[in-house]
Design a protein with these regions (language model features):
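Conserved C-terminal helix/tail region of periplasmic/extracytoplasmic solute-binding proteins
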Residues: 334-382
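Short, glycine-/small- and polar/acidic-enriched structural segments
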Residues: 38-41, 48-200, 205-210, 214-221, ...
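C-terminal motif of bacterial Sec signal peptides marking the signal peptidase cleavage site
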Residues: 21-24
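Bacterial N-terminal signal peptides that target proteins for export
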Residues: 2-13
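Secondary-structure end/capping motifs
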Residues: 263-349
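Bacterial signal peptide processing site
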Residues: 26-29
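Sec-dependent N-terminal signal peptides
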Residues: 15-17
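Pocket-lining segment of extracytoplasmic ligand-binding domains
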Residues: 122, 203-206, 212-302
């Protein structure tokens, strides 16, 4: 019995010692995680992809407001975020949708956002009212303004002169509507010769389709895809592009408040470097960029064909122009910019300013870093 008891005791002591050793080993090991070295970090459609929390904290947060809902024409920003170009520059970039160019500038002016994507002409009007709190463009990503008047050929409006006596629909703050007096001057008609019908942006195309107005003003990158989606064809449309009638305006730019510009010069340089790198990627492979934008659409409501047409119009008429081929993405032709600024001063009845009061190129990357990729490197948009 004594022999059996001793044998059982040794067995119990062995099990206890093994248990204590296992506990000690586990307490000294690092805590386990659900990710492995091969896992992709969690991402969102509006946030750069940090590797971990400490890495995110080391980056400077940059808040961006878009001009409107996220669209395919925002592809350069999305590419730069999702491919980590901003993160490489030490930035954590987030964005939110906009509610029109004027609203984006207004919110940028309040300091809610660090960077706004909007046009310099609305910014000029803001600066006229807020001379001590100015907004400045640090780069232009749309070389041509998307302003137009659009109608149906069946309405019998074949030339701008045929707009006389007609009803044009647009939201009150619409850029093309605000610039209409300048357009009217160029085409030799009185700006008071038309009647304006005001509606919410989402109802603009509906009013035209229902015949409540004879034409609408707005951005052709918004109106044309909407019309095609509603069953119209390009042959059904009569479009008066403002830049075909003497208003050679720039489109949207990358805007900051003067105070932010003074305090964050390096962040602005880093943002522009990463953004125009994204633009180059967009031009090289627009189909991949389009698919990336759609993949980040959390609403799952994006129509790929409509967004494809929008991006096609942007690439052909706004992003890749002879001027951009010469000066690179983000730059301007000083004489052209000066002329459009002077036209805006006259049209908006503003205090005199120069191009230097609304635009600076001192934060742009070196020209060779933001050139348009050669044609041989560009894939078609499919």
């Amino acid at each position: 019995m004594s022999h059996i008891f001793k044998k059982q005791l040794r067995k119990i002591l062995f099990v206890a010692a093994s248990t204590l050793l296992l506990v000690a080993c586990n307490s000294s090991a690092p805590p386990s995680t659900t990710a492995t070295s091969g896992d992709k970090p969690a991402t969102s459609s509006s946030t750069a992809t940090p590797v971990n929390n400490s890495d995110k904290k080391s980056k400077q947060d940059i808040r961006v407001q878009l001009p409107f809902l996220k669209q395919s024409t925002d592809a350069a920003l999305i590419v730069a975020i999702e491919k980590g170009y901003f993160a490489e520059e030490g930035l954590n970039v987030t964005y939110e949708r906009g509610f029109g160019n004027a609203d984006t500038i207004s919110k940028l002016g309040t300091g809610k956002y660090d960077i706004g994507f909007s046009d310099i002409y609305n910014a000029m009007e803001f600066n006229d009212k807020n001379p001590n709190d100015k907004i400045i463009a640090v780069g232009i990503y749309q070389n041509k303004g998307p302003y137009c008047i659009l109608t149906f050929k069946e309405n019998g409006i074949k030339t701008p002169a045929d707009l006389v006596g007609k009803k044009i629909g647009a939201p009150i703050g619409d850029g093309a509507r605000k610039l209409f007096p300048l357009f009217a001057s160029e085409v030799k008609v009185s700006p008071d010769a038309v009647t304006w019908e005001t509606m919410e942006p989402k109802l603009r195309e509906t009013f035209l389709l229902q015949g409540k107005v004879d034409a609408v003003s707005g951005f052709y990158i918004s109106i044309i895809p909407a019309m095609i989606k509603n069953g119209k064809t390009m042959d059904d449309l009569q479009i008066f592009y403002y830049d075909d009638f003497g208003l050679d305006f720039y489109g949207n730019g990358i805007l900051v408040k003067q105070d932010f510009m003074t305090k964050n010069p390096e962040a602005i340089k880093s943002f522009l470097k990463a953004y125009f790198r994204g633009m180059q990627e967009l031009v090289k492979d627009p189909s991949a960029a389009l698919d990336l934008v759609i993949s980040t659409d959390q609403s799952k409501l994006m129509d790929r064909e409509a967004e494809k047409l929008r991006l096609k119009l942007g690439l052909e008429r706004m992003y890749i122009t002879p001027e951009v081929e010469a000066v690179g993405f983000g730059g301007v032709d000083p004489k052209r910019l000066e002329k459009s600024v002077a036209q805006t001063v006259t049209g908006f009845k503003l205090k005199p300013v120069t191009a230097a009061d609304i635009f600076t190129d001192k934060f742009l990357p070196a020209k060779e870093q933001r050139m348009v990729p050669p044609v041989s490197d560009r894939k078609p948009l499919l």
